[in-house]
Amino acid sequence: MDLRGTRITVHDMTLRDGMHPKRHLMTLEQMKTIAQGLDQAGIPLIEVTHGDGLGGSSVNYGFPAHTDEEYLGAVIPLMKQAKVSALLLPGIGTVDHLKMAHELGVNTIRVATHCTEADVSEQHIRYARKLGMDTVGFLMMAHMNSPEGLVQQAKLMESYGANCIYVTDSAGHLLPDTVKARIGAVRAALKPETELGFHGHHNLAMGVANSIAAIEAGATRIDAAAAGLGAGAGNTPMEVLIAVCDLMGIETGVDVFKIQDVAEDLVVPIMDFPIRIDRDALTLGYAGVYGSFLLFAKRAEKKYGVPAREILVEMGRRGMVGGQEDMIEDTAITLAKAKQAQGVAA
């Protein structure tokens, strides 16, 4: 398909999804420096919150270095052209968090639910629309629902007032054909004026290919992160996506070289470990497991002596979804006891 002249909005995840591998401990200075670099490179929309969204600070998800208010309050006044978004998961974030974000100047709110639970987003989507915000319905773990099932969920979010719907590959499990099937079905079912977005992860090295497939099928908002900084093997690497789009004639408004410099000079130096497709991140994609489970599984491996890969495969078998981080330790204990029993029996 010839995509020359197609215009998309790239949405940066470095300062939100990138909080997962940083254990939510980015400093205000790191946030500000990276956000300014992204702004200068031409990124139009930048997400800033705890990795698990507004209100994510907790024992279950991890305590950040600063509050959402502090991060948003530091970044928003510095932006010259970029708008700032925030993620909100009903059950973690509340309407009060949403109100706070709006008062601080957040432009876009993305209300995220599991891909079969759009009904829990109604209150938050309706309130965001009442505030006049750019309101996005964000259907996570999209591989766990059929194209037809996603259509029904997307239409619910649209009926609540969402002006954009995202098909979200939280596990990095989808392939270009399965992305096209889902995006194409949802695009055909929504109102023409409702935008469609895609959020990819790079666990099977498909982030860029899947994003291009999504654009071919009608998505106009695409998520990515500088140097791929994000959960699992990271998000779609922004600098690669921008280069590929430029070669294909897809218009992003982002400077090809400036975004490379942000990735190389600002983001890579703050990584606590390389964002790459190691065997555990690959297992996330292969088994269809929620991306932010990775570090929890690695910690459980050290504590219980059960390989992270085995924990992740079992989590996939059980069909665990985002928000069930507490079950990772339980799964590790169960597997450790089973190994111990096998050892005794032997």
Swiss-Prot record:
Substrate binds at residues 16-17, 170, 199, 290. SUPFAM superfamilies: Aldolase (SSF51569), post-HMGL domain-like (SSF89000). CDD domains: DRE_TIM_HOA. Its EC number is 4.1.3.39. It catalyses: (S)-4-hydroxy-2-oxopentanoate = acetaldehyde + pyruvate. Residues 8-260 form the Pyruvate carboxyltransferase domain. GO terms for biological process: catabolic process; L-leucine biosynthetic process. Mn(2+) binds at residues 17, 199, 201. It holds the Pfam family DmpG_comm. GO terms for molecular function: 2-isopropylmalate synthase activity; 4-hydroxy-2-oxovalerate aldolase activity; manganese ion binding. The record marks 16 as: Transition state stabilizer. The active site is at 20 (proton acceptor). Keywords: Aromatic hydrocarbons catabolism, Lyase, Manganese, Metal-binding. It comes from the Bacteria. The keyword Cell membrane does not apply. Belongs to the 4-hydroxy-2-oxovalerate aldolase family. HAMAP family: HOA. This is 4-hydroxy-2-oxovalerate aldolase 3.
